[in-house]
Amino acid sequence: MPHARTRNPSPIPEVTWDTGLKEMNETWKGAIACLGVAVFFVMTIGIIYWQVVDQPNKNWILKGTFSGVIWERRSHSLLIQTLAEEKTFVEIGVGELGTPDGDAPFVRNLCWSNKTEFCYTWDAVVELKISAEWPDAPDTECYRLSWSPLRCQVDLQDCFSMANVSWYGGAALRAQSWPINAANTTMQPFTVSNLREQPAGYGSVLERYFLGSTGVAVLVDPEVPLHVGFDSRQQFCLRTPASAEQQPLQYTLCVGRNAKSVHQEVGRQLSAHKRTLPNLDILRLPFWKLPVNVDSAVKLERELRTFSNRLKRHHLGEGVIALNEHSTSLLADTDHDSLYGKKERKRQARDLSLIKLLNISVTLSPFLSINSRQFLASLQEGTEEYWLSLSAALRGRPIPLLTQWKGNFCVKLNISNPAAVSWFLDKVGALHARLGMEYVILEGGEGSPVEEQALQPQRALSSDAYIPLLAGVAARIGDAAILTSGTRSSHVPLFLRMNQLQDDWSYSGLKGIIPSVLHYSLLGYNFFIPDAVGGSLLGEFVTDPELFIRWLEIVSFLPVMVFQTPPWLCGDDKVVNLTRAYLALHQEFIVPLIVKYAEEWRTSQSPIYRPLWWISPEDPVTFTIDDEFLIGDEVLVAPVTERGTVHRDIYLPGSTLQWQDRSNGRVFDGGTLLENYAVDLETVAVFVQRPS
């Protein structure tokens, strides 16, 4: 029977619902997928736009109470600014550090849980940690920066901009400038060099401390193997060179209201030792370098008596006759008597007793000629460890290192060896018993034969560790010792002899005196002996009376007056008379001032010799003045440093102060520029602050 189909009563035609739903789902899925791709594409474009275009160029990465650290991503630099961003203390260029993309972000703090720290690992090359610190002073705050390489052979370098900042401190230079913005030196180890041998190096006085006029101070850790370079008027850079030891670059950066306030706080960290005054009797006696170079003790003794008599004949007062190292060795020679017969020995003994009646200074160094009897005896007696040496692998005995000192092959005292130090002190004691000298000048602390020969030094004698140790030896000699180099030793109560200068008007000569005075004083070395009048670098007499007089005028306001050219050999009686006058001025006016402010330095650490910005730390005019200085806050000295001129511009700091010309009594308001002020050849412009 045929099957009868049931009729559909509904007006809607029959459809297969499963198939239709499946097709609908596929359509919606495709639309959603397209929409997702579109959204993802838009988000990607947005992120790229934010990263490249819309992301702020500056990002705060750490904030203190009134200042903070900003990352400037396009220039790859750190900015230290006030929180209101109205003042930039310093800009630090950090370089690429392995990041090829100069626009790479640098805002992810890995120390996010600690609000006083910022940490970041840069391309697995170096790790940066910045910690905020707060000293006792309420208007000073510090940031501790530590760059740590994460692999070997990574150069670390931070460069400090000189734009709108005058920088001070660091190291003495052959041509000293104040501020140091004009310096131009290649990147080199930041150690004290002998500027006579290495005129492009760093010399005499050096500290890992830099002060900026905006109120910023940088103090580099003493353990860092530091290299420093100056790019004139652009920047100076701190660097730790690539090595297998993965040495970090670490320093503390402090900011304050101005340069004076931050220096008063941070400058204390230059030396944690108690401040003690040296023997100030040295202020009262000029030093006269014996102007002869003889080859025998007999001739030397004759010249000593003759020179002493000439000083008396010209009424130049009592002074100290200074002997160089060669002359000292002639008088110290223990074979001196054996060169003569019995009659001559008696005369020599009589002459030495006359020498003891003179005020003399001798010059010694930690160097010993390899041709000397003492050195040969040390080899025979097995005391080679008295000298800086290398250990011999086979025989176990040290091998002394050769170096050069004043044209001779020498060895250098191993100052970390107590037996060697005792031997040296015995040598000084014997010399004092023989000559009765007033002062001992100790040269030769700078340089290291170990590092000069690219050898691995003992840690105790690496870099500038030798100089503080030598200062300790000098202190054991007594307060009659005088040093010629200083680093990390400003607390030692001894005088320091300054760099030798050229006999000209340049910054390597007369113009460099005041910048050097301000540099030494800022770093804590207030008790210094300037170079001889007219300069002593070339060892020749000054033949220009004008140069001699202008030089004389400057040094008469410094702690000790030193002469190499006798005034009677430079010009006529006028030069001798002026020398007498300025010796008297030094005794009657300057020495009491130095004694007064020496006590202030001991208690407050304020320098004796001060830049003009010490009185006006907010006055930008004072930041670059390098031919005026203050003694304390009460005396301003403005010498003439240009050849052939009897006028100069003089700036008087302190808008609320008044200054009186010491020579004519005229009174001027502070904050005033005296243009074309008359200063005769025989005079120095000196102003005394009037009490308010």
Locate each region found by the language model.
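Juxtamembrane membrane-interface segments at transmembrane-helix boundaries in membrane proteins
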Residues: 18-29, 457, 509, 618
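Short helix/loop capping segments that flank catalytic or ligand/cofactor-binding pockets
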Residues: 218-221, 227-230, 262, 331, ...
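Hydrophobic membrane-insertion alpha-helices, especially the h-region
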Residues: 32-49
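Short, low-complexity, Lys/Arg-enriched N-terminal segments of secretory-pathway carbohydrate enzymes
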Residues: 1-28
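Catalytic core of carbohydrate-active enzymes
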Residues: 74-79, 93, 473-481, 486-500, ...
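Catalytic and substrate-binding clefts that recognize carbohydrates or anionic sugar/phosphate headgroups
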Residues: 52-282, 291, 297, 308-310, ...
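Aromatic- and carboxylate-enriched substrate-binding clefts and catalytic-loop regions
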Residues: 315-583, 615-617
